[in-house]
Swiss-Prot record:
GO terms for cellular component: cytosol. It comes from the Bacteria. Residues 40-219 form the Helicase ATP-binding domain. DEAD-box RNA helicase involved in RNA degradation. Has RNA-dependent ATPase activity and unwinds double-stranded RNA. The lineage of its organism: Bacteria, Pseudomonadati, Pseudomonadota, Gammaproteobacteria, Vibrionales. Residues 422-435 have a biased composition (Basic residues). It comes from Vibrio vulnificus (strain YJ016). This is ATP-dependent RNA helicase RhlB. GO terms for molecular function: ATP binding; ATP hydrolysis activity; RNA binding; RNA helicase activity. The keyword Nucleus does not apply. Residues 401-413 have a biased composition (Polar residues).
């Protein structure tokens, strides 16, 4: 773990419980990121916060640190049973909930605090057994948490700390009714420590904070550039007919160590996967209907390097911790300009450089003006030579059905090393759009 830091604020100087500091130091965390340096003093004073911060800024560590410190320095409610959670952390996706849990476990290893997961797509009985063994911090998605609540596995009467992560995404996915259902079954806002984090503090997010929090202080960490100064952005204008050949040619020209390819629909992702798998690439597919265990396996393979390319819908764009992504390909420009930022933000993290390549095709070029207005700069444009594109592409493999998702990761084939020697260079001299 790198010993660099962004601020001069040390965790040890914040007045945290010694057990919390010990857990942080064991993981190599000594100095705060900006969101941590701003949020933790407020939270340690007992004040609620509504924080605006992008993924990758350290917000997860901020709310985990505050939650654990609050539980260690505050007495549990009298008469509380071990199966009744004292803190609840709500996330919009299963993957994000799992990541938060994995980040939490080493921090509480020596504190006696027990964490448990609750999310759909996984064994109900396994999660139930964990909860019945005792839980202090419940981490999960709202649907499964409500399922357990309605089954009277636990109640929410003893909640002393609440975290709502990626609140804007909760709205996007239609979970806001679930959130309100849970909030209304907890102690009053002034009787608990409340933390809300969101990429944007839109009117609807602020309204939610006003409704279910106690006079929250707004903490905002704006990136210097929405897209990050370490990310090299590049834009092509391919015809629909050239898109797949251009993608394959650029992959072999760039030869990325680890790349994510985003498309706007499940159908398009499956088509891209089928072409890349047929060409011998080690490629995984991540869409919304991939079974949970398979999703976890694909992400593990991608993280460990046995899969080089991940084709995904925006389910993978936010919340997931995937280190060392070198390239992001926007096969389709997203319909939501914020999703462009979240997509390319998967690369260029933790001080590393990254490369984002986007296709403004016949179907999605219409989204480009809104994206460039949002990121406040034009994306450098490159031309390509159609005659330099790979022409001998094999026919795509048959796309597996949903019941055969485990076959969607082709890890056995070699990468297309024979084509790399062709040294194709489809790019023409760069043409930069006028600002």
């Amino acid at each position: 773990m790198k010993k660099t830091h962004i601020t001069e604020q040390k965790f040890a100087d914040l007045g945290l419980n010694p057990q919390v500091v010990e857990g942080l130091e064991k993981k190599g965390f000594e100095f705060c990121t900006p969101i941590q340096a701003l949020a933790l003093p407020v939270l340690l004073s007992g004040q609620d916060i509504a924080g605006q911060a992008q993924t990758g800024t350290g917000k997860t560590l901020a709310f985990l640190t505050a939650t654990f410190n609050h539980l260690l320095t505050t007495h549990a409610h009298e008469g509380r049973q071990p199966t009744q959670p004292r803190a609840i952390i709500m996330a919009p996706t299963r993957e994000l909930a799992i990541q938060i849990y994995n980040d939490a476990e080493p921090l509480i290893a020596s504190t006696g605090i027990k964490a448990a997961l609750a999310y759909g797509g996984e064994s109900y009985d396994k999660q139930l057994a964990k909860l019945q063994g005792g839980v202090d911090v419940l981490i999960g998605t709202t649907g499964r948490i409500i399922d357990f609540y309605k089954q009277r596995v636990f109640n929410l009467n003893n909640i002393q700390a609440v975290v709502l992560d990626e609140a804007d995404r909760m709205f996007d996915l239609g979970f806001i009714k679930d959130i309100r259902f849970l909030f209304r079954r907890m102690p009053a806002p002034q009787e608990r420590l409340n933390m809300l984090f969101s990429a944007t503090l839109s009117y609807r997010v602020q309204e939610l904070a006003f409704e279910h929090m106690h006079n929250p202080e707004h903490v905002v960490v704006e990136p210097e550039q929405k897209t990050g100064h370490r990310i090299q952005e590049e834009l092509f204008y391919p015809s629909n007919e050239d898109k797949m050949a251009l993608l394959q040619t650029l992959i072999e020209e760039e030869w990325p160590d680890r790349a994510i390819i985003f498309a706007n629909t499940k159908y398009k992702c499956e088509s891209i996967w089928a072409h890349l798998a047929a060409d011998g690439h080690r490629v995984g597919l991540l869409t919304g209907d991939v079974p949970q265990k398979k999703r976890e396996k694909i992400l593990e393979q991608f993280t460990q390097g046995s899969v080089d390319l991940l084709v995904a819908t925006d389910v993978a764009a936010r919340g997931l911790h995937i280190p060392q992504v070198t390239h992001v390909f926007n096969y389709d420009l997203p319909d939501d300009c914020e999703d462009y930022v979240h997509r390319i933000g998967r690369t260029g993290r933790a001080g590393a450089s990254g490369h984002s390549i986007s296709f403004a095709c016949e179907d999605y070029a219409i989204n480009l003006p809104a994206i460039e207005e949002y990121i406040e700069h034009t994306i450098p444009v490159s031309d390509y030579d159609s005659s330099a594109l790979i022409q001998d592409l094999p026919a795509p493999v048959r796309t597996p059905s949903a019941r055969n998702q485990q076959r969607r990761t082709n890890t056995g084939g070699a990468r297309s090393g024979d084509r790399k020697s062709n040294n194709r260079r489809p790019r023409q001299p760069r043409q930069h759009k006028e600002a």
